[in-house]
Design a protein with these regions (language model features):
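Beta-propeller folds
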Residues: 4-396
Length: 396
C-alpha cells in the first residue's frame, strides 16, 4: 500500500514578515488585568486585554503601546494609523501636517467602555493618580489638556512647550511661551499644576527652559534656564524650587566650583538623589562657537593623528558626536547649599550608590591605559573613591 505523499508547505518571506511576537506586556497593580502587545516583524501590532481568568476582554489595533492607570481602573492605549494607509499617503507625497495622527483610547476596565481622543501629538500619564496630560494637533496648536481619566475634571493651558508629571505625587510641571495678545495675555514661565491647588508660577521668563526634573515625591523641582535662546549652549543657569516656592538660582557659568572656562550643560539630565538631599547635574568645557565670519570652503580642514595618541583615529571619528556631548557630573548639596565638581577630564566616569544617598561615590578613568588597550584588546581602569564630606578622591 502506497502512502500518500504530503507536500510540505514552503516557508515564504510573507510568513516571516507576518510572524508575531510579544513586544510589550504588563500586569495591573491589583493583579486582575493583563495586557500584551503582539507585533509582526512588519505590519500593525495589536494590544490584547485579559482578565485574571485568562479571558480576552478587548483588543486594540493598530496599536503602538498601552499602560494601566495607577488605580487599575483604566487601560490607556495609543492607536496609530495603519501601516498600509501611511505608506499609501507617503507615496502620494502627502505633507506631514496632513498625515493622520495617533489616537488615545481610555478604556474603563469595569464598565467595559472606551473613550477616544483624536489627533494626539504627545501625552503623559501620571504614575500615582488617574490623571492624563496631552497635546493635540500640529505643533502650532500648543494647548495642553490635563484631565482625570474618568472625565470628572479637566483644565487646559495655552502656549505650552514642555510638560511632565512627578514620579510620585499628583503634580505636573509645564512651561509656557506666553502671549502678548491683548485679547488673551498669557504669562511666560515655568508652572506647576496640582488638582487640589491649581497652577503656581515658579519662574517667570520668556527664555529657554531645559531638563526640568522633579524629585521623586514632587516636592522639589530643578531646571536649567537661559534668557536668550541663542546663548543656551553656553549660558544656562541652574535653578531649584522647594515646596512650590518661587525658584532660586543655584549656579551659573561663573560659579567658582567649576573649572575655569566650564559651563552648565544640557546634555546630562538633572536628577535628585532618592532622599532629595542632593542634586546631580552636568558641566562641560564651553563649546567652541562656529566662526560665522568665514565661508566653510575657506576654513582649513586638516586631520592629524599621532601614533602616541591613546585612541585610534578611526575610533575618534566614530566617537566624535558622543564626545562633543560629553559631560562631567557635579552635585549640589541642599543641606550645605554647596556645589562640588565630582567628575573631571582626568576622572570622567562617576557611579553613585544607593540612588545617590550613599556617602561614597566611585570615579573611574581609562586614560592611562588607552594606548595599551589598542594592542591587548581589553580596557583597564583606574578607580577612585570620593568621599562626599571632603570631596577628595582616593585611589581604590
Amino acid at each position: 500500500m502506497l502512502q500518500a505523499q504530503v507536500t510540505k508547505k514552503t516557508l515564504t518571506w510573507d510568513d516571516v514578515v507576518s510572524w508575531k511576537q510579544i513586544t510589550d506586556k504588563a500586569v495591573s497593580d491589583n493583579g486582575k488585568w493583563v495586557f500584551c502587545k503582539m507585533a509582526p516583524w512588519r505590519g500593525d501590532a495589536t494590544v490584547y486585554l485579559y482578565n485574571e481568568m485568562g479571558e480576552e476582554k478587548a483588543s486594540f489595533q493598530p496599536a503602538e503601546g498601552a499602560s494601566f492607570s495607577s488605580s487599575s481602573q483604566f487601560l490607556v492605549v495609543t492607536e496609530k494609523p495603519a501601516l498600509k494607509v501611511t505608506e499609501e499617503l507617503k507615496l502620494k507625497k502627502t505633507k506631514e501636517e496632513n498625515m493622520p495622527m495617533n489616537k488615545l483610547v481610555i478604556y474603563n476596565l469595569q464598565a467595559n467602555e472606551k473613550e477616544v481622543i483624536d489627533s494626539i501629538r504627545s501625552f503623559k500619564l501620571s504614575e500615582t493618580a488617574d490623571w492624563l496630560a496631552y497635546q493635540r494637533g500640529s505643533k502650532a496648536d500648543s494647548a495642553l489638556y490635563v484631565r482625570a481619566l474618568d472625565g470628572s475634571k479637566s483644565v487646559s493651558f495655552a502656549t505650552v512647550t514642555d510638560f511632565g508629571f512627578a514620579k510620585k505625587g499628583n503634580v505636573l510641571f509645564y512651561t509656557s511661551a506666553g502671549s502678548d495678545k491683548q485679547e488673551k495675555k498669557e504669562t511666560a514661565g515655568l508652572f506647576t499644576y496640582a488638582p487640589e491647588n491649581g497652577s503656581t508660577l515658579l519662574y517667570e521668563g520668556k527664555g529657554v527652559f531645559k531638563n526640568v526634573s522633579f524629585d521623586e515625591k514632587g516636592d522639589k523641582l530643578a531646571f536649567l534656564y537661559c534668557a536668550e535662546k541663542d546663548s543656551a549652549a553656553t549660558a544656562l543657569s541652574l535653578y531649584i524650587s522647594e515646596k512650590n516656592a518661587m525658584a532660586r538660582l543655584i549656579a551659573d557659568r561663573k560659579n567658582s566650583a567649576f573649572p575655569a572656562g566650564w559651563v552648565i550643560s544640557e546634555n546630562e539630565n538633572i536628577r535628585f538623589s532618592a532622599n532629595s538631599g542632593r542634586l546631580f547635574f552636568g558641566t562641560a568645557p564651553e563649546p567652541k562657537q562656529k566662526d560665522t565670519t568665514m565661508l566653510a570652503e575657506n576654513r582649513p580642514n586638516v586631520q592629524v593623528w599621532n601614533w602616541n595618541e591613546g585612541i585610534q583615529y578611526t575610533q575618534q571619528l566614530n566617537d566624535k558626536a558622543k564626545e562633543l556631548k560629553r559631560t562631567y557630573t557635579a552635585v549640589f548639596n541642599l543641606k550645605s547649599n554647596k556645589i562640588y565638581q565630582l567628575a573631571t577630564i582626568d576622572m570622567p566616569d562617576l557611579k553613585v550608590a544607593d540612588e545617590g544617598n550613599a556617602p561614597l561615590a566611585l570615579l573611574t578613568s581609562s586614560k592611562a591605559y588607552e594606548k595599551e588597550s589598542m594592542w591587548k584588546g581589553s580596557l583597564l581602569r583606574r578607580r577612585f573613591r570620593i568621599y562626599r564630606e571632603s570631596f577628595r578622591p582616593q585611589e581604590a
